[in-house]
């Protein structure tokens, strides 16, 4: 399902500028980092694809969905997200994809059928953090949270198993995870 950008409300104070961008892994594979973020020009955000939201000041997004969007959490089907290898002459630039949590709910990373590390934006430190299922790391994606993957050659899709959907933030080692409680707010967020 998709959300049109025009239907996303922002609580604005004064006049601010904002933009939604997608990540172009093919551009990175060809030319390295620096020009990989592209403006969303079609006015539609697609479930499963990651985006960055940037604003000239802190704003709060309200995304309204229809009943079909709400039923996505209840469907027994897994979600299959296509990814691109993006072959490059440099291994560090190859295979990068920005994936969005395809469910409108919290999601435990252990439900992803993908064994390479995932990289998430840490809005508190303005850095990226890496997590690995193989290293028994724990991470819970918030609704509308995006993350980077560097896909190995031969990988065409990433599967999200429905059993790891969560109605609220999860307990990890007996504590509420702060990342899963994060709001989609601020000047820069991956969604």
Q: In which residue ranges do the predicted regions lie?
A:
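Cationic, amphipathic, low-complexity alpha-helical segments enriched
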Residues: 172, 177-191
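Short amphipathic alpha-helical linker/capping segments at the junctions of internal repeats
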Residues: 163-173
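N-terminal exported-region signature
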Residues: 1-165
């Amino acid at each position: 399902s998709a959300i049109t950008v025009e239907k996303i409300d922002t609580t604005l104070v004064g006049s601010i500028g904002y933009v939604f961008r997608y990540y172009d892994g093919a551009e990175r594979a060809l030319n390295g980092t620096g020009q990989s973020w592209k403006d969303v020009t079609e006015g539609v955000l697609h479930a499963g694809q990651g985006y960055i939201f940037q604003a000239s000041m802190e704003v709060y997004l309200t995304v309204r969905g229809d009943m079909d969007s709400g039923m996505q959490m209840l469907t027994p089907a897994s979600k299959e997200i296509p990814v691109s290898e993006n072959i490059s002459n440099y291994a560090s630039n190859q295979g990068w994809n920005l994936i969005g949590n395809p469910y409108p709910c919290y999601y435990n990373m252990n439900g992803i059928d993908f064994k390479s590390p995932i990289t998430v934006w840490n809005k508190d430190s303005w850095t990226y953090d890496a997590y690995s299922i193989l290293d028994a790391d724990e991470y819970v994606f918030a609704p509308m949270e995006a993350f980077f993957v560097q896909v190995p050659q031969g990988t065409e899709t990433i599967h999200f198993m429905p059993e790891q959907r969560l109605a609220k933030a999860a307990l990890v080692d007996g504590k509420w995870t702060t990342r899963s409680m994060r709001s989609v707010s601020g000047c820069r967020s991956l969604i």
